[in-house]
Structures are given as C-alpha cells and as structure tokens.
C-alpha cells in the first residue's frame, strides 16, 4: 500500500501530471456545464470530478505541511458533501463552498510551486500555467456560489438561479468571461460582492498571463 501511494505521488509530482490535470480541468470547466444542462446526472458528475481534482492535490507536493492541509480540507469537503447528499435534513452549503475555495487556493499554490520548482521550461510547464488559470476560474465560480447563498443574489440577466449545484453552469461561465475579460453582457453581476469579484477576476486575468510569461521567459534566458 505504501509503495502504491509513493508511485501515485511520484506521478503527480512529475511534469506529465500537468496534462492529466488539464484534462480534468477542461472537463470540469468546459464539458461538465453542458452535461449538467442536458442530463440529470450532471450534479453527481460535478461533485465527483471536483473532489477528484482536490484529491490529486494531496499528492502533488512533497511538503508535509501542504499535504496535511490539503488532506484535511479534502476530508472536510468530502464529509460536508456526503452530509448534504445523505438521507438527513442537514446541509452546510455555504461552509462546503468556503472549504472548496480554500482547497482551490491551496491547490493553486501547490501548482505554482510545481510550475517554478526549477529552471526547466517545456511544454508541460506551459500546460501547468494553463491549469492554474483554469483553477482561478473554478475558484471564481465557487466564490459566486457563496455570494449567492449568503446574500440571495449574485448574477442577473439571461439567467435563472436555483440556489443549487445546477447554478455552477452559470457561475463558471461568468467566472471565465470575467477572467478572460470577454464579458458578453448576457449575464452580469447585480450586487457589490459579485461586481468586485468580477473586477478581481478581470485583474487576475490580465496580470497572471503577463507575470507567468515573464517568469518563464526569465527562467529560459537564465538557463541558456
């Protein structure tokens, strides 16, 4: 069992894992919303895929502290999800998503450490940078869920929100359009919290690629 865990960790510490994570994130960010809109099983797939992404974060670092934090957050997140979907009257929807945001932030930090752990610059590192970008979009969607659950309002326009996991379809769409500064205008923020989040995501969307590209170019130059 210990050897299996070591092999699993060795894979997630290698550059090849960036591609696997990219596939998972593309599924979560671009494919899953379509499935959730047309299928009754979309919510289950959303929760399984989200937890799978966070589970991989436990093995993506050699730092005992980060592994412990990631494992604790994953365990709490899993427990809260099971409570909500179990046959009981209890639900901690806001806390569940707050833990999800914390888990995403930790995973972003872990991936940035992997991305810049040495001076190697290759296609896998570019994929790693894309992964962080998509994780930022995921963080934005989870934050919108918290805002909507806490205030009762978040997005307006061509959208009907139900206050359930099905709203992820609209939240990830708005998060991505804000992050990429596309802003089609069909969906818009309706309260201050959502507006400031959209502004924050737009700022990240501009600064993150510039900073990462500059860093990768600097590493390539110093190596050569």
Where are these regions (language model features)?
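Structural signature of hydrophobic alpha-helical transmembrane segments
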Residues: 34-50, 93-105, 169-174
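Cytoplasmic-side transmembrane-helix entry/capping segments in multi-pass membrane proteins
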Residues: 65-76, 93-101, 121-132
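Membrane-embedded alpha-helical segments in integral membrane proteins
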Residues: 2-3, 22-36, 54-55, 77-85
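Pore-domain transmembrane helices of cation channels
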Residues: 107-153
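Short, hydrophobic transmembrane alpha-helix segments
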Residues: 30-44, 57-65, 86-87
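N-terminal membrane topogenic signal
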Residues: 5-23
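Pore domain of cation channels
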Residues: 166-224
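Outer-pore turret/helix-boundary of cation channels
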Residues: 36-38, 48, 139-173
């Amino acid at each position: 069992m210990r050897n299996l865990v070591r092999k699993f960790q060795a894979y997630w510490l290698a550059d090849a894992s960036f591609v696997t994570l990219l596939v998972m994130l593309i599924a979560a960010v671009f494919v899953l919303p379509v499935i959730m809109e047309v299928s009754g099983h979309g919510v289950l797939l959303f929760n399984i895929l989200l937890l799978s992404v966070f589970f991989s974060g436990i093995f993506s670092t050699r730092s005992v502290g980060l592994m412990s934090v990631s494992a604790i957050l994953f365990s709490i997140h899993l427990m809260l999800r099971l409570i909500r979907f179990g046959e009981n009257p209890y639900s901690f929807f806001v806390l569940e998503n707050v833990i999800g945001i914390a888990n995403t932030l930790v995973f972003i930090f872990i991936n940035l450490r992997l991305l810049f752990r040495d001076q190697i610059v290759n296609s896998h590192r570019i994929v790693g940078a894309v992964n962080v970008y998509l994780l930022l979009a995921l963080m934005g969607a989870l934050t919108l869920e918290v805002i909507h659950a806490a205030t009762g309002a978040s997005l307006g326009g061509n959208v009907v929100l139900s206050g359930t996991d099905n709203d992820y379809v609209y939240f990830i769409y708005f998060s991505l359009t804000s992050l990429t500064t596309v802003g089609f205008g069909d969906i818009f923020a309706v309260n201050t919290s959502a507006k400031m989040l959209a502004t924050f995501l737009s700022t990240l969307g501009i600064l993150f690629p510039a900073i990462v590209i500059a860093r990768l170019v600097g590493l390539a130059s110093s190596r050569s």
